[in-house]
Design a protein with these regions (language model features):
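A metal-dependent, Asp-based hydrolase signature
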Residues: 32, 38, 52-89
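Hydrophobic packing residues within well-ordered alpha-helices of enzyme cores
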Residues: 26-30, 103, 128-132
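Substrate-recognition "cap/lid" segment bordering the active-site pocket of phosphatases
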Residues: 118-120, 124-154
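Active-site neighborhood of HAD-like aspartate-dependent phosphohydrolases
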Residues: 1-49
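An amphipathic alpha-helix signature
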Residues: 26, 41, 45, 65, ...
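Short, acidic loop-to-helix structural element flanking the phosphoryl-transfer center
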Residues: 61, 65-66, 83-119, 125, ...
Length: 154
């Protein structure tokens, strides 16, 4: 087989859990959550993914922001955390999740090596724009692609 056909030209990443630390929202509320921080993070993420799978199977798409809020509501109720202000704070923090510490340098090295860099995510376009901007990654990404254009979670 011709080596030119095998040449990698682009590196495409998932956003949440790969570039952005979804745990950073709950960690940012540790002052209120205390020892429930880890449990909230784990259950919120599990429900978020489960809701995307269920919606896909049922053909009932909703954007990832709605799924994220629904998963948080379930999680807070399950953990007995009833606090509208905390809910708002968690969702605000989720829109601007921290990226993992190595991400900027890795993306920079990939760009300098000539690779096209991109995100392909379940995230809604606005969520992704906020996360990329908040983490200062805009200049390091060539494309930010959301499943919203096709209306089906990956």
């Amino acid at each position: 087989m011709n080596d030119a056909k095998l040449k990698v030209r682009a590196c495409v990443f998932d956003a949440y859990g790969t570039l952005f630390d979804f745990a950073s929202a709950a960690t940012g509320c540790r002052d209120v959550l205390g020892d429930k921080t880890g449990a909230l993070t784990a259950l919120w993420r599990d429900k978020q993914l489960q809701y995307t799978w269920l919606r896909g199977l049922q053909g009932r798409h909703a954007d990832f922001w709605q799924v994220t809020a629904d998963a948080l509501d379930f999680t807070m109720e399950s953990l007995g955390v009833v606090d509208a202000g905390l809910r708002t704070r968690l969702l605000d923090l989720y829109r601007t999740l921290r990226c993992f510490s190595e991400v900027p340098e890795v993306l920079k090295e990939l760009k300098q090596s000539g690779f096209v860099t991109a995100i392909l995510s379940n995230g809604a376009p606005g969520m992704l724009a906020d996360a990329v901007s908040g983490a200062g990654l805009g200049a390091l990404l060539d494309h930010v692609l959301s499943v919203e254009q096709v209306g089906v979670f990956k």
